[in-house]
């Protein structure tokens, strides 16, 4: 899907809290196809439009990696068809129950009932890739410090 190239994989973990000393060398190579696409024949990519799932860290313009072979279960983020279009939502409901709801994390969108036939599950989102250097809704844009001359 992405070609056969590999990228450098640092041997150290990156701290999300307090920084820790890091090694200055590369331990291995990582193939993003293997890391992001466990089942290539059932994996699809879709670009996100809108911010209804921003509460789940899924932003406008993000790239979703979707696996159609996985069983959707409550709590997972899924892609569904609704009104002739694809939507991304969190599946809510009881496990093993034929009914459920597709819920956005923005608190504004109306939940969609699966039982009423309004929507059909299409696949399970396994990764969301987003660009960190672009502005994020609700946050001030990244600004470089002014040079002191």
Which residues fall in each region the model found?
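Short, positionally conserved secondary-structure boundary motifs
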Residues: 1-54, 74, 85-86, 97-99, ...
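Structural motif
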Residues: 61-62, 76
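Short beta-strand-centered aromatic/proline hotspots
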Residues: 76-78, 88-93
């Amino acid at each position: 899907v992405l070609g056969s190239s590999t990228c450098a994989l640092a041997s150290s973990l990156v701290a999300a809290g307090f920084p820790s000393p890091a090694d200055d060398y590369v331990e291995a190579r990582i193939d993003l196809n293997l890391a992001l696409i466990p089942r290539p024949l059932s994996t699809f990519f879709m670009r996100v439009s809108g911010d209804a799932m921003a509460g789940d860290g899924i932003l406008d313009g993000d790239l979703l990696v979707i696996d159609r072979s996985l069983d959707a279960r409550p709590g997972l983020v899924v892609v569904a068809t609704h009104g002739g279009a694809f939507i991304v939502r969190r599946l809510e409901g009881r496990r093993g129950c034929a009914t459920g709801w597709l819920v956005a994390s923005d608190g504004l969108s109306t939940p969609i009932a699966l039982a009423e036939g309004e929507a059909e599950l299409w696949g399970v989102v396994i990764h969301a890739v987003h660009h960190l250097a672009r502005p994020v809704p609700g946050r001030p844009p990244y600004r470089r410090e002014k040079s002191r001359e």
